[in-house]
Curated annotation (Swiss-Prot):
Its main location: plastid. It comes from Dunaliella salina. One of its GO terms (biological process) is electron transport chain. This is Ferredoxin-2. Pfam families: Fer2. One of its GO terms (molecular function) is electron transfer activity.
Length: 95
């Protein structure tokens, strides 16, 4: 499993995320309450920003190349591919 540090408005939380689990699902299993809506990678409710490390969000269909290039991630369809740090609650920063 990878260690994923989530920087939330209520503080930093580090959780373990298996390579085949979506980050949002793992966060919920750890008792964290993160924003989401569609859970299908087709909206921006769950958006976060990768501060360090790498993720795979090839299942997402909402973010354009520029947004992905700036580090934005849809946590509902993102897998960790290394230990990483992600700022959550970033939907407003997208626009």
């Amino acid at each position: 499993a990878y260690k994923v540090t989530l920087k939330t408005p209520s503080g930093d939380q580090t959780i373990e995320v298996s390579p085949d689990a979506y980050i949002l699902d793992a966060a919920e299993e750890a008792g964290l309450d993160l924003p989401y809506s569609c859970r299908a990678g087709a909206c921006s409710s769950c958006a976060g920003k990768v501060e360090a490390g790498t993720i795979d969000q090839s299942d997402q269909s909402f973010l354009d190349d520029d947004q992905q290039g700036r580090g934005f991630v849809l946590t509902c369809v993102a897998y960790a591919t290394s230990d990483c740090t992600i700022s959550t609650h970033q939907e407003e920063s997208l626009y």
